[in-house]
């Protein structure tokens, strides 16, 4: 992010689409009571501010992922961007109001009043910390949820 701030207005800056999409997986082993509840997982999806993450990580140069396929990587049979076509059916829009409602329902179903989650990222990446900070900030708006961050090298957290 610091280098982007420094060079963002430079006419020499060239921006290329990346062929990667970063995503999260929820540990559903049962070790964290609550993550097996579909309403809680959906609430976390709705409470994930993808645009906020993209902005904090790239100073607005990246776009928020709307699916597993990166924008500009593949075309549909009609020549359109496959990522845009697929997003219509799969994307979660940031909706903290709906997230709070679903989270409360899920917590009640799971018999929980409080829950602590740990989000992990790699210390090998220059963007992991700002990504985790944004996730922590938005998820902790859900009543009863505490979010901890864990950074480690890929062999520890990947």
Regions from the language model: what does each represent?
Residues 4, 23, 37, 41, ...:
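Extracytoplasmic/secreted envelope proteins and their assembly/folding machinery
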Residues 1-31, 56:
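Extracellular/periplasmic solute-recognition and catalytic clefts
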Residues 19-21, 64, 114:
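Extracytoplasmic
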Residues 1, 104-158:
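Ligand/substrate-recognition segments at binding pockets and active sites
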Residues 18, 27-29, 56-58, 69-72, ...:
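Active-site-proximal beta-strand/loop segments in catalytic clefts of secreted hydrolases
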Residues 64-105, 124-129:
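Structural transition elements
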Residues 8-9, 31, 40, 45-62, ...:
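Sec-exported extracytoplasmic/periplasmic mature domains
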């Amino acid at each position: 992010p610091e280098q982007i701030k420094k060079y963002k207005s430079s006419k020499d800056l060239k921006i290329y689409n990346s062929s990667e999409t970063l995503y999260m997986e929820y540990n559903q082993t049962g070790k964290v009571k609550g993550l097996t509840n579909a309403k809680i997982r959906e609430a976390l999806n709705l409470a994930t501010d993808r645009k906020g993450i993209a902005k904090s990580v790239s100073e607005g140069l990246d776009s928020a992922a709307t699916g597993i396929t990166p924008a500009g990587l593949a075309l549909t049979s009609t020549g359109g961007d496959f990522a845009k076509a697929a997003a219509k059916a799969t994307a979660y829009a940031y909706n903290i109001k709906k997230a709070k409602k679903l989270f409360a329902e899920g917590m009640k179903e799971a018999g929980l009043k409080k829950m602590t989650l740990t989000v992990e990222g790699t210390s090998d990446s220059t963007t992991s910390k700002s990504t985790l900070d944004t996730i922590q900030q938005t998820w902790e708006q859900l009543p009863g949820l505490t979010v901890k961050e864990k950074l480690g090298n890929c062999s520890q957290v990947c």
